[in-house]
Design a protein with these regions (language model features):
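Start-transfer (signal-anchor) and selected internal transmembrane alpha helices
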Residues: 1-41
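Membrane-integral, polyisoprenol-dependent glycosyltransferases
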Residues: 1, 41, 100, 106, ...
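Transmembrane-helix motifs of polytopic, lipid-linked glycan transferases
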Residues: 11-19, 117-144, 174-175
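Transmembrane-helix signature of polytopic, membrane-embedded enzymes
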Residues: 25-30, 137-158, 187-188
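Short hydrophobic alpha-helices at membrane interfaces in multi-pass membrane enzymes
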Residues: 150, 179, 183-201
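Intramembrane catalytic core of multi-pass membrane enzymes that act on lipidic substrates
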Residues: 25-127
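Multi-pass, polyprenyl lipid-linked donor-dependent membrane glycosyltransferases
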Residues: 124-129, 148-179, 183-184, 206
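Transmembrane helix irregularities
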Residues: 41-46, 155, 201-207
């Protein structure tokens, strides 16, 4: 399995390099939006981190402290959401910042006791963040570079598998960092500095 994974990674890197050499044009917005919607039809894969996110959000909305209480200890290990967490994270309290934990709580509030619905609500946030990075980069970079954005981010196999389809929290942190850069680019002066500071703080409060 490890060998296959490394082969896939090498192929992805080669594909990105070849894509950059072709000087590609930008992809129409309907493509990434459609891809994002399709990603919601399948559960995240590659790791069980999305189950951790669901559990910490569940603990938060139920009045607990996800930074001090472990998933396995919550609800005597019988809670339909927290009991789904996989080893070795069953005994680990949250290591995530307050902002992203609030987002996890929002997903948990939407899904209630339905694990798939909680995870899907989280996936919606990931899709929005993934699209947000694309929008932010297009805002900062000249139009001639928009095709490169799609090669390096939107259609990058590593980003798609780990960030989008894996539903990792890093996608949200990345979106916030890009938003900070876009704010400085869009609003020079005090407004941009303040906005960038807010987005940077939120990124730091994610992971």
């Amino acid at each position: 399995t490890t060998g296959v994974l490394w082969i896939a990674i090498v192929c992805a890197v080669v594909g990105v390099v070849l894509g950059l050499r072709q000087r590609p044009g930008p992809v129409a917005w309907w493509g990434p939006i459609g891809l994002g919607l399709l990603s919601l039809l399948a559960a995240p894969f590659g790791s069980g981190d999305h189950l951790n996110y669901a559990a910490y959000g569940r603990i938060l909305v139920e009045g607990g402290d996800p930074w001090s209480e472990s998933p396995i200890a919550w609800g005597n290990g019988l809670d339909p959401i927290t009991s789904a967490v996989e080893a070795p994270w069953t005994t680990e309290p949250s290591v995530y910042g307050p902002f992203v934990t609030l987002l996890q709580g929002g997903a948990a509030a939407v899904g209630g006791t339905d694990l798939r619905l909680v995870v899907m609500a989280w996936q919606v946030l990931i899709v929005l963040a993934w699209l947000g990075v694309r929008a932010g980069l297009r805002m900062v970079l000249d139009r001639e570079h928009h095709g490169r954005i799609d090669v390096l981010w939107t259609l990058n196999p590593l980003v798609l598998t780990i960030g989008l389809l894996g539903a990792h929290v890093d996608t949200i942190a990345t979106a916030l960092v890009v938003a900070a850069v876009a704010a400085l680019s869009r609003w020079p002066g005090p407004v941009g500095i303040v906005a960038a500071g807010v987005f940077t703080g939120l990124a730091a409060g994610s992971k």
